[in-house]
Amino acid sequence: MQSCGRWWGRLAARGAPRHLRPAAGGPRRQQQRWGGGEAARCIEQLLPRHDDFCRRHIGPREREKREMLSAVGVQSVEELMDKTIPASIRLRRPLRMDDHVVENEILETLYNIASKNKIWRSYIGMGYYNCSVPQPIARNLLENAGWVTQYTPYQPEVSQGRLESLLNYQTMVCDITGMDVANASLLDEGTAAAEAMQLCHRQNKRRKFYIDARCHPQTIANYTGVITELKLPHEMDFSGKDVSGVLFQYPDTEGKVEDFSELIERAHQNGTLACCATDLLALCILKPPGEFGVDVVLGSSQRFGVPLCYGGPHAAFFAVKENLVRMMPGRMVGVTRDANGKEVYRLALQTREQHIRRDKATSNICTAQALLANMAAMYGVYHGSDGLKDIARRVHNATLILAEGLRRAGHKLHHDLFFDTLTVTCGCSVKEVLDRAALRKINVRIYSDGRLGVSLDETVNEKDLDDILWIFGCESSAELVAEGMGEETKGILSTPFKRTSKFLTHQVFNSYHSETNIVRYMKRLENKDISLVHSMIPLGSCTMKLNSSAELAPISWKEFANIHPFVPLDQAQGYQQLFKDLEKDLCEITGYDKISFQPNSGAQGEYAGLAAIKAYLNAKGERHRSVCLIPRSAHGTNPASAQMAGMKIQPIEVDKNGSIDISHLKAMVDKHKENLAAIMITYPSTNGVFEEEIGDVCDLIHKHGGQVYLDGANMNAQVGLCRPGDYGSDVSHLNLHKTFCIPHGGGGPGMGPIGVKKHLAPYLPTHPVIKIQTDKDACPLGTVSAAPWGSSAILPISWVYIKTMGAKGLKHASEIAILNANYMAKRLEKHYKILFRGVRGYVAHEFILDTRPFKKTANIEAVDLAKRLQDYGFHAPTMSWPVAGTLMIEPTESEDKGELDRFCDAMISIRQEIADIEEGRMDPQVNPLKMSPHTLNCVTSSKWDRPYSREVAAFPLPFVKPESKFWPTIARIDDIYGDQHLVCTCPPMEAYESPFSEQKRASS
């Protein structure tokens, strides 16, 4: 009975909600097995598991796999792999990893790891603050698959919800900062500062950039090609007219609020741009930078309802004067109209972005932080202007009380005017203060010169203030200090720095302050957007696979969410163990020797990897090597990243089969052999084939002194099958938001850690606050992200995916991704030309349909097919990339045969509609493709004058049913109008009026 009771207790604890479980002990001991290939033990045969994650993650059932294998003309998955992947690079052994763990057990194990993190009260500041995450937003947005599994809103007809929310974000940023135009977020504040520096350089072509030494240390960055100088404002000399821009922090990292008007005036007189890093909450009561002439404003919106997350993910904001809008990096939502003249939303000015401008893009960044920007936007919508001002005043008042108490206790405050941060020279022993802080489990900022910093936030209450006063030896309570302050202590509110301008006056920020209304508003927006909860999203090179509930569950655990990124490492041992586990597994999967988790996106990983190559070559005395070879079919981020890393780009041609043109490559290598730095290649190629000569390409580059950068965007076709580090690559980034299941979030977050071979390991990113390089020979390249380990809080997603799949499951996922793609290609090849195949006639995990001939035969283009697919309930494949006028399809391993067949049926049906146009049965101008997508308003309108039926428009195949159909909410977008009439803030209320309101106003 005792034994039964003990087992029942374990089972009950495993099934209980995490916060109700008993204190965690050590993780359950497991047998270490490589690849899971041995016969099952007797106990496993008697107690079969029903919660094996692999069969939940992989879509096709065994019968469906057999049917698909038969359709593509092979007997087994292994035969398909042999015919798809070059034999010279195949991995012929199992991955050396622990056997898979079932879902419930892995969450128990992960919670044991998370419990090693110590949740202290952190008042370290430096751009990271505790905040209260409104539960309606956490429950209905952050933890909602309808929001987190959306793709970037490049198809606006099925993305109006998140586009509206991101427009709210932009409007909020513009209003609070006093600027003209904002983008839809960047990766973090440090990245935003680097982007501001690049913007200044692009604007006036000057090479020098001043940085106020009182910026946050992680914000001070040095990018190749721009000379940065740390100076105080009075030391900055602009008379040489060689300074592109100046960056200052307001309030600064020590908390001081300072008037920068004179500095800005001096800068502008000499053609220098002024950039301000700031705090949105402070600006709710503080004069905004836009009112004293700043050109660029940036910062983090983390404290608007996003947890600390050990550094990320968080959305940075970026706003500029109107004259700089076309220089601005990142995505930007704008207002335009649809085919019916309705005011709608879209991504504006995309010609600035890397997928079009390539090496001349305004930024190499492809991923933003859409999910976190949406959380911050909803925080602003939920609280409104009055609510935000109340929160800001509360934080400021708490800081005033603390300041008064510290003065009474004999401590010196370094600044008289502040918002939420105090810098203190202790009147007693610093060690004594820190010892008392440890007793209360409180973290403060420790300066190298012995001063201490305390930054308060919206979560601080009276007890917190009492504890902080106690650790500094103050005998008075917060209540007694407050009573003695009197009305004359108003801080910012009694100075010229007090904000007098209104903000967030738009109705959207004044309508949803009850939980009922905010929940309904979020649901209304969610219902406008297609996501993985509706149907497959077959975007080539984007890997829109399952983001499982078990993987996503840990991101909101307080043990991961409530850790400041700059706490001592002994308070983050859970995170450190997770990083080590994940690094070990990723090194085994890729064949690399070392991983850096700092890059927040694939593009940032590209920059970090190329910068490591450049640092390595410089250390060898080969600084002259700067030429980077890039195939013309490469991701647009590749040339943009190479340009940012200070390299010169040499394009390489692609042959008719979609592979690198070897003869042209050899010619370019020979031409640039003295200056060759690297080649950037994607494998399998962006054309969807495993190139046979990949090993020879790597050998050729190495022979001539270069390094091989392998873009990891297509890693989903390689896991367990081949390893980049084995066939010659020196460095790769890994898109954890593709291959390793971090959701796309409607355009971010992402993670792009880089893996390197041993010789590049000393040149991985470091950090100015937390030491992360352990290599004794380290010569780090600097910092590429604000936080030491990037977006730490989403790494548990990839960790859970790898642990629950195990070596065997990971390999099988890649196999089924390839099988699914080949099955779809086989079904569609009779109706569309498959543009590229491997040497034995098979594709990799994605393939390209050539739709270019339809332009001549029926005046139909790829965009028409993309929009028509929305009527069938599908998001479009990748459009016009890597070949203009084509569609690239990637099904992933998570979709079952039924969903693949539905998509293929839709594409075949659309091909028949094109044939109807070609053969004169359908009008060449007014047809289901040209008029798509068809909205519910359109189909139910009393007026229908089109030469095809409503059924053809809205229900073209039997599986498209009224009760389950996803409806596009707007007609086709007018992109040209949107760029010609750029509006990037919420439109006036007249745009939201009903016809009844218009009639009423007209009659009056």
UniProtKB/Swiss-Prot annotation:
Q: Which InterPro entries match?
A: ArAA_b-elim_lyase/Thr_aldolase, GcvP, GDC-P_C, GDC-P_N, GDC_P, PyrdxlP-dep_Trfase, PyrdxlP-dep_Trfase_major, PyrdxlP-dep_Trfase_small
Which cofactors must be present for this protein to function? pyridoxal 5'-phosphate
Could you list this entry's UniProt keywords, alphabetically sorted: Mitochondrion, Oxidoreductase, Pyridoxal phosphate, Transit peptide
Tell me, in one coarse class, where this protein mainly resides. mitochondrion
Write down the Gene3D superfamilies for this protein, in alphabetical order: Aspartate Aminotransferase, domain 1, Type I PLP-dependent aspartate aminotransferase-like (Major domain)
Q: Residues where N6-(pyridoxal phosphate)lysine occurs?
A: K738
Record keyword Mitochondrion present: yes
Q: One GO molecular-function annotation for this sequence?
A: pyridoxal binding
Write down the SUPFAM superfamilies for this protein, in alphabetical order. Answer: PLP-dependent transferases (SSF53383)
Q: What is its EC number?
A: 1.4.4.2
One cellular component term (GO) for this entry is: mitochondrion
Q: Transmembrane residues, as ranges?
A: none
Query: What reaction is this protein's catalytic activity?
Result: N(6)-[(R)-lipoyl]-L-lysyl-[glycine-cleavage complex H protein] + glycine + H(+) = N(6)-[(R)-S(8)-aminomethyldihydrolipoyl]-L-lysyl-[glycine-cleavage complex H protein] + CO2
> Which enzyme class, named as a word?
oxidoreductase
Q: Does the keyword Oxidoreductase apply?
A: yes
Q: How is its activity regulated?
A: Stimulated by lipoic acid. Inhibited in presence of methylamine.
HAMAP family tied to this protein: GcvP
Subunit structure as annotated in this protein's UniProt entry: Homodimer. Interacts with GCSH. The glycine cleavage system is composed of four proteins: P (GLDC), T (GCST), L (DLD) and H (GCSH).
* Reported function: The glycine cleavage system catalyzes the degradation of glycine. The P protein (GLDC) binds the alpha-amino group of glycine through its pyridoxal phosphate cofactor; CO(2) is released and the remaining methylamine moiety is then transferred to the lipoamide cofactor of the H protein (GCSH).
Name the protein family.
Belongs to the GcvP family.
What name goes with this protein? Glycine dehydrogenase (decarboxylating), mitochondrial
The protein's organism comes out as: Gallus gallus
